[in-house]
Amino acid sequence: MYGKMKEHLSRTLAEIREAGLYKEERLIESSQYASIQVAGKEVLNFCANNYLGLANDPRLIEASSKMMQERGFGMASVRFICGTQDIHKQLEAAISDYFKTEDTILYAACFDANGGVFEPLLTDEDAIISDALNHASIIDGVRLCKAKRYRYANADMADLERCLQEAQAQRFRIIVTDGVFSMDGNVAPLDKICDLAEKYDALVMVDESHSAGVVGETGHGVSELTGTYGRVDIYTGTLGKAFGGAMGGFTTGRKEIIDLLRQRSRPYLFSNSLAPCIIGASLEVFRILKESNELHDKLVENVNYFRDRMMAAGFDIKPTQSAICAVMLYDARLSQVFAARMQEEGIYVTGFYYPVVPKDQARIRVQISAAHTREQLDKCIAAFIKVGKDLNVLK
């Protein structure tokens, strides 16, 4: 039987390669930081989600090691059997405090949080109204649910209102959006979304994966930026980006929603609890962020410095209030060649092109970190200018 399937898989893989869409994994030979080792060469990393520079922070490493010594390596159980330690509840409380919500539930990843939120809450009597550029985990979570589906154009409030009007016959309606859209770096207009939700009696859910720790005056996310605390019903997010970059996800929001997810969310019920070492480091993250805004302030300074100088050099940069800077090249082949040339210059960035982004919207996505020094930013900018001139992107 596998002979036939092997032929089919081989053809499919060949088609992926021929289309230029085959994903190669480049091996990193060091810890994750602003500077990393790739193929025996030191390069500056500008494509990690390590927004606050905490992935290799000594304080997190110490807290993780200490917790593992005290509480063991793994839980070997799901939460509702014997996989809940007091530290799990402490982390859930810390996340609730950070987002100003009533309760929190932990998952192995935000993919699980988004995959496990809709089906327990909604039925075929209800409606999910989702932004067209939402993350794949939201899309997959919606597919697992029987609710009627609507999709509105990215951050388009007129189109969202159209969907809300069409969904008025449904029992419950929920608007779902990323806080920051990962390919463009644009921020959802959450205040306007909440206005429409209140007008048409809908719930609001925001995925804060790329915005928590980054967006807002102190980095507390899109609700802080837009003044919408208390108006959002559900937040999902990850511990794998700004909050240390390891693993773990969460859903935080209204108490009754979280209570029901504990009873019926399948990724929560049937996945092992987060390991104590992850919990220990994550508790340290929220302690650090409660104590000081220093890392967020440094990130904002770095983002503004990079954007201003790249735009002054003549690059087309998408507007953003996040740490994601999309350097627009528009041509798929050019984006691949540009990224390869940047690595030759000692800068690790990635080119994105169709189908990850729309046709003729190819770009280099640059992700800035609080860990980047001014010297490293200058080196990255200089490399962009050099390669840009060599490839006739800049005159």
Placement of each model-derived feature along the sequence:
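Short loop-beta-helix segment that forms the pyridoxal 5′-phosphate
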Residues: 78-84, 92-116
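Conserved PLP-anchoring active-site segment centered on the Schiff-base-forming lysine
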Residues: 117-136
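PLP-dependent aminotransferase class I/II
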Residues: 243-310, 315-318
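PLP-dependent enzyme catalytic core of the Aspartate aminotransferase-like
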Residues: 58, 62-66, 70, 93, ...
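N-terminal "arm"/small-domain region of PLP-dependent enzymes with the aminotransferase-like
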Residues: 6-73, 202
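Conserved PLP-binding catalytic core of the aspartate aminotransferase-like
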Residues: 297-306, 311-346, 356, 360-361, ...
